[in-house]
């Protein structure tokens, strides 16, 4: 498993402390990217899910080109709001914008650019448990709905023969902010469980029936780490950074699969063949077919205005995206993200031609 570079060190400290403040509101977020170039650099805001890889990319890109990118890791909902209001140059989200959100954007049409793929993992704090816990989508829905409340419930022990599970309460931990990670997790539950689809349903924010809240992936990781009996959902990189275990989830083929670069890549095996440069890239790979596919996988997106009013910033944004597809992707696996398939990256490079520079 990777260990993040020095610029990301404070994130682990915050998670260990159970801190629930947003990265975008702390000095750590700007450690590698707060400076600006002669004409202001680029500003962005949004998802915490890809913050580790974006932090690395922005630092590497600044070192190569001198273009500084200031990114606030405030959650997908916040990134969509700031882009829609025109206060940042780009947004970032783990949930694609819906039609209503797109229609409300002040700067006109918005394009979705997938950057990497990742996994949302189900992490837990069960002292003494060595092997990965095995869970089905039905059991997950029952736990997060408050219908299964004890770790030694028969619905859980029957999936984990030979494993001694405690008779203690299950404490659910969920996000409190508008979150793409929540969208990925609840979309998966809604896709696999009719009762969950009926309510709470899927979204960046839902009315959780039970549980405690944490802000950002950091906050949820911190809550789970310091609370025996807790269960929550976070991005894979945050689980590895905080040495948190994660469950093997039953996929659409019936196999129990742990999250990994290989199992996330397997979830996207056939995507590239269905897309072109002009496709609508608001797509889902949740509960994908294939015996090796991890079912709670997702793309994450950068969101950019199709018509860039500032030609200098517009070109910088296009150049950065091109760099991410041609070079930046090489660092993804070292930070527990799955790079996009080569064929898909080439189609996204062609898609950059849809961005108009300097037009209102």
Regions found by a protein language model. Name each.
Residues 1-8:
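Bacterial N-terminal signal peptides that target proteins for export
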Residues 9-13:
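Hydrophobic helical h-region of N-terminal Sec-dependent signal peptides
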Residues 19-360:
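Flexible loop/hinge segments at secondary-structure junctions
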């Amino acid at each position: 498993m990777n260990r993040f570079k020095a610029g990301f060190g404070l994130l682990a400290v915050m998670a260990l402390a159970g801190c629930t403040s947003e990265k975008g509101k702390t000095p750590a977020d700007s450690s590698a990217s707060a400076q600006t170039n002669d004409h202001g650099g680029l500003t962005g805001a949004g998802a915490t899910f890809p913050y580790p890889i974006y932090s690395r990319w922005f630092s590497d890109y600044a070192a190569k080109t001198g273009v500084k990118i200031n990114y606030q890791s405030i959650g997908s909902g916040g990134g969509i709001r700031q882009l829609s209001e025109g206060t940042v140059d780009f947004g970032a989200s783990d949930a694609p914008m819906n039609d209503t959100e797109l229609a409300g954007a002040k700067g006109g049409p918005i394009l979705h650019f997938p950057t990497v793929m990742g996994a949302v993992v189900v992490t837990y704090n069960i002292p003494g448990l060595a092997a990965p816990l095995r869970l089905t989508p039905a059991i997950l829905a029952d736990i997060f709905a408050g219908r299964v409340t004890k770790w030694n419930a028969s619905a859980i022990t029957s999936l984990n023969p030979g494993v001694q599970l405690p008779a203690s309460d299950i404490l659910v931990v969920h996000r409190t902010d508008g979150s793409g990670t929540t969208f990925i997790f609840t979309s998966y539950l809604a896709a696999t469980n009719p009762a969950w689809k009926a309510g709470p349903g899927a979204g960046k924010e839902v009315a959780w029936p039970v549980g405690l809240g944490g802000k950002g992936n950091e906050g949820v990781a911190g809550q789970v780490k310091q609370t025996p009996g807790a269960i929550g959902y976070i991005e894979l990189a945050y689980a590895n950074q905080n040495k948190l275990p994660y469950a093997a989830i039953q996929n659409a083929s019936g196999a129990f699969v742990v999250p990994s670069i290989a199992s996330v890549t397997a979830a996207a095996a056939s995507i590239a063949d269905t897309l072109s440069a002009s496709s609508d890239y608001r797509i889902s790979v949740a509960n994908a077919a294939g015996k090796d596919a991890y079912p709670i996988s997702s793309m994450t997106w950068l969101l950019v205005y199709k018509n860039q009013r500032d030609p200098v910033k517009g070109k910088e944004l296009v150049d950065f995206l091109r760099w991410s597809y041609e070079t930046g992707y090489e660092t993804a696996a070292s930070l527990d993200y799955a790079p996009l398939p080569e064929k898909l990256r080439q189609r996204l490079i062609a898609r950059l031609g849809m961005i108009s520079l300097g037009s209102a």
